[in-house]
């Protein structure tokens, strides 16, 4: 089809016919690049049987969106097929894969959550694109609305329009979003108190839980029977009010 169109154009320009020497046309076909949201070679947790340890773990934590997570029987082996990371495959084990995706759904990294109760390292974060922030849920939010920021991917599934930081060094300043920071309910943690204070100084809204709430994070609050969405919305503060609430809440 392209060749026929080319010949027709040359004919119109008088550049074809007997005695005419015309160079053969060159067509520059670029190899198409297709984005994918599929996690290669892994099974979504939603497709596992009810008794499977990975599915049982998430369901016991009341996480309903099982399609968002995958089961990986050999984490080191699978990771090395995505990006050479581990020098040895010894002591390989199963983990739940938590994909980190951009707004278009393309995976740029992932976390592996151990299924072993006494694992020394519960979460391992692997970045396939080091230019991206260690953030979970960018594909799940509406950036035109307030975006809640939680401390863990599982916590983000208990409130609407939420992302999660997958590391202590996450910088969200590159995003022009209206953030509401939802740190863990740990008033004796100097680190968390400092993070809440910094968010207030930068003009962000923060969530400061009432003293009646004893659970540490959103997942625990859901397991305890709290309406997490209402709890978060009714305890969101900013400015001077946030600073006063922080002073009342902290224990350090």
Residue ranges and their predicted role:
Residues 77-178, 183, 191-193:
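Phosphate-handling DNA/RNA-contact segment within nucleic-acid enzymes
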Residues 175-180, 217-230:
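Short, surface-exposed amphipathic charged segments that create phosphate/polyanion-binding patches used
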Residues 183-185, 195, 236:
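Conserved catalytic-core subdomain
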Residues 63, 204-205:
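Short phosphate-binding/catalytic loops that engage adenosine nucleotides
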Residues 190-202:
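Short, aromatic/basic amphipathic alpha-helical patches
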Residues 1-75, 117-122, 197:
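Non-catalytic accessory segments of DNA primases and related replication-initiation nucleases
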Residues 205-215:
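A generic structural motif
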Residues 1-13, 68-83, 88-93, 222-251:
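Short, small/acidic-rich helices and loops at N termini and domain boundaries
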């Amino acid at each position: 089809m392209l060749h026929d169109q080319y010949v027709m154009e040359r004919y119109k320009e008088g550049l074809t016919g007997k005695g005419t020497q015309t160079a053969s046309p060159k067509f520059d076909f670029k190899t198409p690049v297709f984005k994918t949201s599929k996690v290669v070679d892994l099974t979504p947790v939603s497709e596992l049987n009810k008794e499977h340890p990975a599915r049982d773990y998430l369901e016991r934590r009341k996480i309903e969106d099982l399609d968002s997570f995958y089961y990986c029987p050999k984490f080191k082996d699978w990771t090395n097929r995505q990006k050479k990371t581990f020098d040895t495959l010894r002591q390989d084990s199963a983990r739940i894969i938590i994909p980190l995706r951009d707004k278009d759904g393309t995976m740029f990294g992932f976390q592996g959550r151990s299924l072993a109760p006494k694992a020394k390292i519960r979460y391992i974060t692997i970045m396939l694109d080091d230019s991206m922030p260690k953030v979970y849920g960018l594909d799940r939010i509406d950036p035109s609305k307030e975006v809640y920021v939680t401390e863990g991917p599982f916590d983000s599934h208990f409130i609407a329009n939420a992302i999660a930081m997958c590391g202590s060094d996450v910088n969200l300043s590159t995003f022009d979003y209206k953030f509401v920071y939802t740190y863990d309910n740990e008033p004796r943690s100097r680190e968390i108190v400092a993070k809440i204070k910094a968010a207030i100084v930068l003009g962000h809204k923060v969530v400061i839980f009432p003293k009646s709430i004893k659970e540490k994070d959103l997942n625990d609050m859901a397991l305890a029977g709290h309406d997490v969405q209402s709890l978060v919305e009714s305890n969101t503060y900013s400015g001077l009010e946030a600073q006063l609430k922080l002073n009342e809440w902290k224990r350090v």
